[in-house]
Amino acid sequence: MTRLPKLAVFDLDYTLWPFWVDTHVDPPFHKSSDGTVRDRRGQNIQLYPEVPEVLGRLQSLGVPVAAASRTSEIQGANQLLELFDLGKYFIQREIYPGSKVTHFERLHHKTGVPFSQMVFFDDENRNIIDVGRLGVTCIHIRDGMSLQTLTQGLETFAKAQAGL
C-alpha cells in the first residue's frame, strides 16, 4: 500500500481560493439566500472548483488536514472556511502573519506529527523553500488545488518515503 502522510497542510490564498483574502475581497463575508458566499460589497466569492472534493478525498483516506496561512485577515479567512463548509475538515488552523516555519513548528507541537510525515500545498515558492528545509514534502501549486494536484502530491510524498 502507498504510504500516506500523517498530516496534509494547505495554504489558503491562491491554493484553496483564487484571491488574497486580505486585499482582493472585502470582509465580513456572508452566505446569500441562493447559497453563494459574498463579501461586504456583494461580490461573489468562490473556491477553486475541486477543493471540497480534495478535502473529502483526504478525509476518506484518513489523512488529517491543517491550514497554514500568512494572511493578516485572520477572521475573514476563518469565516470563509466556515461559510464554504470546509471547517469540518481542518484539525488545526495556523492563520496569522509571519514565517510559515513558525506555522509548521506549531503544527508539529500541537499534532505530534513529524515534519517528515507532512505534505504541504502552497502557491508561493518562498514558502515551499522555507518549509521544505524542515523536511516537509512540499508541493508548489500553480493554478489552485485540484484532485490531480492532490494525486501528484501524494505520489511525491510516497516516493520521498520510499527514498526515491
From Swiss-Prot:
Keyword Oxidoreductase: no
Activation and inhibition: Inhibited by vanadate and zinc, and slightly by calcium.
Protein role: Magnesium-dependent phosphatase which may act as a tyrosine phosphatase.
Residue positions of the active site: 11, 13
Effect upon mutating residue 11 to N/E: Abolishes enzymatic activity
Similarity-based family: Belongs to the HAD-like hydrolase superfamily.
pH and activity: Optimum pH is 5.3.
Effect of residue 100 to R: Abolishes enzymatic activity
Record organism: Mus musculus
Binding-site residues, substrate: 20, 70
Residues noted as binding phosphate in the record, renumbered to the chain: 12-13, 69-70, 100
UniProt protein name: Magnesium-dependent phosphatase 1
Catalytic activity: O-phospho-L-tyrosyl-[protein] + H2O = L-tyrosyl-[protein] + phosphate
Domain of life per record: Eukaryota
The EC number(s) this enzyme carries: 3.1.3.-, 3.1.3.48
Cofactor(s) needed by this chain: Mg(2+)
Gene of this entry: Mdp1
Keywords on record: Hydrolase, Magnesium, Metal-binding, Protein phosphatase
GO-annotated molecular function: metal ion binding; protein tyrosine phosphatase activity
Binding site for Mg(2+): 11, 13, 123
